[in-house]
């Protein structure tokens, strides 16, 4: 059995249906962007939500919503309209979250900077030693500094 996490945007509003055995299933079409060489491509996944899971989220799931799903992965084979064999990635959803990078009804979601501007905060990036950094300082900062070096920790450093 394969399990995976996928982040993308809904290509359509959720579809609700009942199986022949009377089980309720909500189907989401999730577009996940991938990069092949220098070209961006979109892989479409069929995400099935079984029973009454995530019912409170359903009114907010619309075409263009950014979501993150996790669940069991399978491949479904079918015949296309022109008669050629096709396959589709199917995810049986165990976890569903709204993406912090999602869009609301075709527009982008408010970002952290937008929220800070609304309440009068100034957005500041903080460096490794707690110093404030501007955009130029961030470019000059070596993100791998200290990688591979042994670190000394005390009990207060460990969160558990």
From Swiss-Prot:
PROSITE patterns per UniProt: SSB
InterPro entries registered for this protein in UniProt: NA-bd_OB-fold, Primosome_PriB/ssb, ssDNA-bd
Entries under SUPFAM superfamilies matching the protein: Nucleic acid-binding proteins
Gene Ontology MF terms in the entry: single-stranded DNA binding
Matching Gene3D superfamilies: Nucleic acid-binding proteins (2.40.50.140)
Domain of life: Bacteria
SSB domain ranges (all copies): 1-100
GO cellular component term, pick one: nucleoid
Keyword Transferase annotated: no
A biological process from GO: DNA replication
Keywords: DNA-binding
Quaternary structure annotation from Swiss-Prot or TrEMBL: Homotetramer.
Protein name per UniProt: Single-stranded DNA-binding protein
